[in-house]
């Protein structure tokens, strides 16, 4: 298997020339943030609607889902309403409804409140919710697992795998047990090849694999 695959450059590159275990999935999602988890959830929903069974794997570099998510956010619940109808009855994380907005124009010595009619729509939050995005992401992870999605936290993706024809075939997770020079120690554990018919990169805007593609 490894002989027919190439590797794209990435961060914390795995040691070359060693045999690695491999797992096959229909879809491999890199990144267990809101986008990656929503993708996994929707794919499983669509498969169920067609009476199909697909395997979906999500890998996350953080020690747990939500560990690398900014702590706070104001969210528009419309996406949750579409993705998970009835989500409010499914034990979501604590949320506070946004009831008022204040936009202030600040000078060196004064502040001026911008009237509601002059506030840009993107800055109006009536009907939205204030929530810990880390908690929301962990909750989404639970919803995904309930649908049969396999989530592997603590497994950073280190490289992209390509076929001989240059198609993305999956990713290699980072090796563990390396010294400061990147050489294997006695505790060395090679990363795994996670192979998918489709690979979704949901690392965020600073994802190193996305920059390498």
Which role fits each region the language model picked out?
Residues 112-133, 142, 170:
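Helix-loop-beta segment of a Rossmann-like dinucleotide-binding subdomain
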Residues 32-33, 133:
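Glycine-rich Rossmann-fold phosphate-binding loop(s) that bind the pyrophosphate
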Residues 53-110:
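N-terminal FAD cofactor-binding segment of flavoenzymes
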Residues 27, 55-63, 196-201:
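Extended hydrophobic secondary-structure segments that form protein cores and membrane-embedded regions
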Residues 65, 93, 97-110, 127-130, ...:
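Rossmann-like flavin
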Residues 1-28, 42-57, 178:
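Extreme N-terminal leader/targeting segments of oxidoreductases
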Residues 52, 134, 138-139, 143-213:
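Predominantly flavin-linked oxidoreductase catalytic cores and closely associated redox partners
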Residues 36:
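N-terminal Rossmann-fold NAD(P) dinucleotide-binding loop
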């Amino acid at each position: 298997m490894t002989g027919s695959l190439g590797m794209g450059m990435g961060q914390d590159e795995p040691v070359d020339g060693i045999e690695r275990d491999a797992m096959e999935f229909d879809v491999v999602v890199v990144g267990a943030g809101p986008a990656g988890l929503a993708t996994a959830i929707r794919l499983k929903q669509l498969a169920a609607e067609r009476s199909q069974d697909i395997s979906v794997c999500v890998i996350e570099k953080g020690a747990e889902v939500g560990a690398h998510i900014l702590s706070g956010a104001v969210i528009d619940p419309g996406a949750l309403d579409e993705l998970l109808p009835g989500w409010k009855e499914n034990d979501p994380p604590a949320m506070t409804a946004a009831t008022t907005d204040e936009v202030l124009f600040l000078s060196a010595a004064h502040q001026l409140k911008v009237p509601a009619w002059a506030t840009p729509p993107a800055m109006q939050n009536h009907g939205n919710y204030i929530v810990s995005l880390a908690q929301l992401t962990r909750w989404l992870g639970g919803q995904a697992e309930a649908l049969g999605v396999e989530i592997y936290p603590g497994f950073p993706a280190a490289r992209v795998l390509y076929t001989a024809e240059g198609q993305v075939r999956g990713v290699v997770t980072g090796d563990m047990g390396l010294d400061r020079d990147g050489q294997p120690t006695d505790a060395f554990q090679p990363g795994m090849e996670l192979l998918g018919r489709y690979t979704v990169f949901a690392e965020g805007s600073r994802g190193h694999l996305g920059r390498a593609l």
